[in-house]
Amino acid sequence: TAPAHLQEETMEGADLVADALGRINRILHRAMDGIPAETLNTQPAAEANSMSWLAWHLCRVQDRHISDLLELPQLWVADGWHAKFGMAKDEKETGTGHSPAQVEALRVDSADLPLGYADAVYERAKQYLATMKPADLDAAINEPQYDPLPTVGVRLVSIISDNIQHAGQVMYVRGLLERQGWLGV
């Protein structure tokens, strides 16, 4: 079917979020499909992140927050993605604060692994967003460490902000390593 903004219906906030997350998923595929593992795992500088690490981290952030909003276990554990990546069964592990050694330790044999995880978390996000009503975006999230409490809408914008930055970094690292110009999106 056509995207919501091309249909006769009014586009809602959740439709915008779904569109943004879909674009992020396509950026990852465009940047990583067919790229050799050596390139995916290369850190362009000693303390820089590899394409594989950036894609993994992007997915972890999206999986964690969407799963929290759904009040469901993260796909990271529920679908065994942690084992596929050879990592601990730890839902709090998203890569934030990783040392250069931890970044270097995350290795993939092909783009299939991070892209498979990206597709899985995006599908979950789409399913969640398809159930939303406009008022749902204004619902407060019970996270008392924040004042004011964040809303579902604020959390979704945070996911987009984080993910679009990291998707752009994946594209940038690919350009650095392959010494090619902008691929576009």
Regions found by a protein language model. Name each.
Residues 18-29, 39-97, 123, 140-185:
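Short, contiguous alpha-helical
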Residues 10-18:
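N-terminal leader segment of winged-helix/HTH proteins
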Residues 88-139, 157:
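Acidic/histidine-rich alpha-helical segments that form the ligand environment
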Residues 1-10:
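Short, Lys/Arg-enriched N-terminal segments with co-localized hydrophobic residues
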